[in-house]
Amino acid sequence: MPVPSPMRLAVTHEGRSIIYIPSPEYAVASGRLEPAWLEVFYNPAMEFNRDVSVVAASALRRTGLLTRSGVAFDAHAGVGVRGVRYAVEAGYVKVIMNDINPKASMLAALNARANGLEPGSYMIFNKESNSLMFHLSRERPTPVSLIDIDPYGSPAPFVDAALALSGKGTVVAMTATDLAVLEGGKARAAVRRYMLRSVSKTPVSKETGLRVLLGYVARVAAAHDKAVKPLLAYYADHYYRVYVAVERGARRSDSMLEENLGRLVYCPETGVALALSYAEDPASACGGSYVVAADPAWIGSLGDQAFLEAMLNIAVEAVWLGTRPRVEKLLNTLHGEAPLSPRSIYVSLTSVASKARVNTPKKSKVVELLRSMGYRAVATHFSGEGVRTDAPWGEVLEAVVKLGSSG
């Protein structure tokens, strides 16, 4: 491997970790850092993503969900900030950091040493991530507990290798930034990349995209005779982030597909979206015409409530997190949404009110009214004007019309 040329460095801090990064001197445009211009990729705007990751990694260890060794694998490490933080802040006994950029390998090693990691507690690779994951899946000198996929763009090209490397008790985490594709804005690309039959842009496409991603991961897992269970799945800023626990076995895989894969439909006459099994008729469910928002897609739960509660408890204690208030706010919202997320799509109040020709009511008032009617209802993290509820769409429409007409 050629020896990387020296680079000028700067220093920053995240959480409890000190991180050396390439000097941003020549990577600033219009007063903002352009991460792709750095000699080694580092995006300070993703600190929130990494803070959530550290809390999730800590919760996996604290709850016992991590049944394998305490080894974390970062497939696209960049400067090594995520892997280092897994060791320093989440207590992982070993971190494996990989990046195809040789300068990244050098910086990741520097950051590991700067944060006091012992030589045997980390490994650095300079490989194409898929080839390394397939290699480790065959060799597997050390079982991997947490596999983290955070590429530039779509995680789709890396899901197969990550699931090949996974075993019983492994958790696979991934970030997707190709939202225009996942949400149906680029339908042909979505069909190719995520193996969809159909996808369309709708007022609730933020959730559609996340469920498309989970559905793709589930189908790739099934090809390995494995099943996945979402522990945490969310939308923030310009990306999706999901964590799935892996189980082995063809029967588990079959059950997962049967119970959690279906189609998402949008009802244009009412503005409501539905998550339907393949046994359910979309026309009957919508009461008329419908648009297929995504097929196939994940229609099961978007999170594990006990795991989210454990994350919340850790976040409250983690006073060193730079984005702690935002982390707590997200986790509180996700904790409320989790039990309502199976077979449910959030309601866009703007869309429903527009179809009903009434003013858009306040979200808090809709939640209050639906609860008074005996249903569960919470705000969603996907949208500032969205509500998640177990109320039938007819009752939702009644609530929106009542409040929208009086306001």
Swiss-Prot record:
Q: Which top-level enzyme class is recorded in the Swiss-Prot or TrEMBL entry? A: transferase
Query: What GO terms describe the biological role, i.e. biological process, of this protein?
Result: tRNA N2-guanine methylation
Known EC number: 2.1.1.216
**Which reactions are catalysed by this chain?**
guanosine(26) in tRNA + 2 S-adenosyl-L-methionine = N(2)-dimethylguanosine(26) in tRNA + 2 S-adenosyl-L-homocysteine + 2 H(+)
Does the UniProt entry include the keyword tRNA processing? yes
Give the residues the record marks as binding S-adenosyl-L-methionine: 50, 82, 99, 128
Q: Which GO MF terms are attached to this record? A: tRNA (guanine(26)-N2)-dimethyltransferase activity; tRNA binding
Pfam families attached to this UniProt entry: TRM
Keyword flag tRNA processing: yes
Which UniProt key words apply to this protein?
Answer: Methyltransferase, RNA-binding, S-adenosyl-L-methionine, Transferase, tRNA processing, tRNA-binding
Q: Which residues form the Trm1 methyltransferase domain?
A: 10-400
| Coiled coil region boundaries | none
Task: Show the InterPro entries listed in the entry.
Answer: SAM-dependent_MTases_sf, Trm1, TRM1_arc_bac, tRNA_met_Trm1_C
The similarity comment for this entry is: Belongs to the class I-like SAM-binding methyltransferase superfamily. Trm1 family.
Q: What does this protein do?
A: Dimethylates a single guanine residue at position 26 of a number of tRNAs using S-adenosyl-L-methionine as donor of the methyl groups.
Q: Provide the protein name.
A: tRNA (guanine(26)-N(2))-dimethyltransferase
Which species does the entry assign this protein to? Aeropyrum pernix (strain ATCC 700893 / DSM 11879 / JCM 9820 / NBRC 100138 / K1)
Source organism phylogeny = Archaea, Thermoproteota, Thermoprotei, Desulfurococcales, Desulfurococcaceae
Gene it is expressed from: trm1
